[in-house]
Each structure stands twice: as C-alpha cells, then as structure tokens.
Amino acid sequence: MILLENVKKIYKAKSGDVTAVDNANLKIDKGEIFGVIGYSGAGKSSLIRLFNQLEKPTSGQITIANRVISAITGSELRKARQEIGMIFQHFNLLWSRTVRENIEFPLEIAGVDKAKRRKRVDELIHLVGLEGRGDAYPSQLSGGQKQRVGIARALANNPQVLLCDEATSALDPETTDQILDLLLDINKRLGLTIVLITHEMHVIRKICNRVAVMEKGKIVETGPVLDVFRNPQQDITKRFVQQLTDSEDTNETIESLIEKYPDGKVVRLQFIGEAVERPVLQRLMQRSDIEVSILQGNIAQTNNGSYGSLVVHLNGEETAIQQAIEGIHQDQVELEVIAHG
C-alpha cells in the first residue's frame, strides 16, 4: 500500500544542512494502523508530510497505491492528494465557517455538486458523532469536537489513507481515548489505512498494529506493537515502553519495597499474549517451598494482544528459589532478577 525507499529530507539552513529524515525505509500494509513515535526533533513530522508531498523528499522514492507520488506534480498530484486525508494537532479549521461548511470545503474544491456535497456531509457528521452540531462554529466546540470536524473533513473525498499529525497531543486523556476509539472504528468500518505520528506510547499501544521508532531522523526500530513491548531493542524504544510499564513513582515504590526485603530475590515477570491468563504464581507456590509476595503489577492491552508485568519477592532457601525460577522459565514467562539478598 505505502512504500518508502531510501527517503531522505534535507533542509537548508544558514548554519548548514539539517537532515530531518535520513534514508527511511518503510512498508505499510493496506488497512493497517501504523504508528511513528519519537521525541521532538526526531523527524516524524517531516516524515509524515512526505506522504502527501507537503514536503518534497531530497532523494528516495515514495509509492502509495502503486503510484510513485514523489515523482508527480501539478494536477496529477492534486488528484492524488484527494486520496490522502490529513488531520492536525491544532485542528486547522476555518473559524468563519460552520461545522458543515468546514466538512464541505474539500468537496467544493473538488467540484462536487451541491446535492452530493450535502449528502456526504450528513454521512460524515453521523460517522464522527456530531449530530446536532452542524451549524455550530469552531469557537463553540470543545477540543474533541473540533478534532472530529477535522476527521470528517479529512474523509470527505473518500481517501484511501488518513495521516494523523500528533492528532491527540492537544487533548486531555479522556478525549484522547475517545478520538482514538473513533479512529479505530473508522479503520474497521472503512478499511482505511491510518498513519499516525506521536510522542505518546499510550497512543501506539491503544490502536496501532505496527510501530516505527524515530531518533535523529533515522528509523531505528520497527515491528508489531506487542513485539516491541516485549523485546525493545534500542535504548530510545525502551524509554518509550517504560512510559507505560515503569513510571517514576512505580520505580521509587519498588526501590523502597526492596529495602524491606533484604533476603531472597526480587524478580520482574513479563507476560505476553496468552501468558497473561496463565496461573503462573499459583503453580509456583504449589510446586515450590518458598514464600511469594507480590510487590507491584500492571497489564496493558495492545492491538496485537495483552502485555503485563509483575514484580514479586521470592524468599526461601537459595536452591528452592533457583528451582522456582527455572519453573517460571518453563512456563514461558520472561524473568529478570532486579535485586537479591
């Protein structure tokens, strides 16, 4: 569906060339939700703007739906852009137009007749849950409602691809989840390919099938979201995963608990997919002559399955503890010793 081959974007500056995207290679399948995550300055905004040619690549090739979009210009590019919708962090609505008129705007530009425009706008207002707000102006809407207008407008011309440029960064957590649920619903209903960029791992976890991690213009890691959660390879990826699995407060709590358990071992168990539902601790206590205390635990649901972790204290004879650890490995649960007496 979408293919990036050795794509590079270099900006000219007085202080010298700035490489925003450095030899990016990506393949995004039709109908998937693909996330790109990175901190500020990683190059992700430059990358997503290459998809619809708001930015031209310095080198490399971009293919969308078997069309080399990086090689076309003029009317052909304008037509291709109608098949690529985009929503933005700050909505980019026309403040002098109503909700209906904002959604209708790209249809006007495309030359769609008035009756068809009206019908399409009605469909989109229903799709994004804005019934009864069609005559309101952007200033009368909440942040979440404004983004719903942005989504409806982006879908006006029935695009094959929807680009999301930090679409939830300006929203509160509850509204963020509502918008993410809407994007999930649209993806399932329309079979729409969604590419989103974000600096929040929560967004990736909640709706993405696969993720690419960017750092200093380079794509340093890609893979299914659950695989990245389970086994992050790069330091930056590990930091993003820790946003959800290890908060600063959690780490401080674990450190204080470790001080209370000077004997035995404190271990972290990681559960992936079906392993989340296994009675691992019950089996451990049944077959081992040790004491088991749960210090901390959490579970997260990704679009590919569940991911969870437990921090537990194992206390008893050293031989019994080692046998318990071997038993945990046999249950195909990943284990890390984080402290031992």
Curated annotation (Swiss-Prot):
UniProt KW Mitochondrion keyword: no
Family that this chain belongs to: Belongs to the ABC transporter superfamily. Methionine importer (TC 3.A.1.24) family.
Subcellular compartments: Cell membrane
InterPro entries according to UniProt: AAA+_ATPase, ABC_transporter-like_ATP-bd, ABC_transporter-like_CS, ACT-like_dom_sf, MetN_ABC, MetN_ABC_transporter-like, NIL_domain, P-loop_NTPase
Gene label: metN3
Name of the protein this chain belongs to: Methionine import ATP-binding protein MetN 3
Assembly, per entry: The complex is composed of two ATP-binding proteins (MetN), two transmembrane proteins (MetI) and a solute-binding protein (MetQ).
Its EC number(s): 7.4.2.11
Keyword Transcription regulation (UniProt): no
Entry keywords, A to Z: Amino-acid transport, ATP-binding, Cell membrane, Membrane, Nucleotide-binding, Translocase, Transport
Binding site for ATP: 38-45
Enzyme class per UniProt: translocase
GO CC entries: plasma membrane
GO molecular function: ABC-type D-methionine transporter activity; ATP binding; ATP hydrolysis activity
Reaction equations catalysed: L-methionine(out) + ATP + H2O = L-methionine(in) + ADP + phosphate + H(+); D-methionine(out) + ATP + H2O = D-methionine(in) + ADP + phosphate + H(+)
Membrane topology: Peripheral membrane protein
SMART domains: AAA, NIL
Domain of life: Bacteria
Domain (ABC transporter) ranges: 2-241
Protein task: Part of the ABC transporter complex MetNIQ involved in methionine import. Responsible for energy coupling to the transport system.
